[in-house]
Amino acid sequence: MSKIKIILNGEEKFLARVMNVAELISDLELDVKKIAVEKDLEIVNPDQFLEVMVEEGSRLEIVHFIGGG
């Protein structure tokens, strides 16, 4: 099985397969409540994480929200 290449936060990353954004977030062990996702220059709403697919050549930016004072 061949891997797919994506760009995640400006760096090449290889995934075992095509997956949706929710699966990628889970694989990266991120808290879905504390991130924002952009795919191919478009913001992905959290209610679309199961529908939006991460495929060969996808460009994603994932931003973490950090609390502080």
What are these model-derived regions, one by one?
Residues 1-68:
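Ubiquitin-like/PB1-type beta-grasp interaction modules and other compact soluble beta-rich domains
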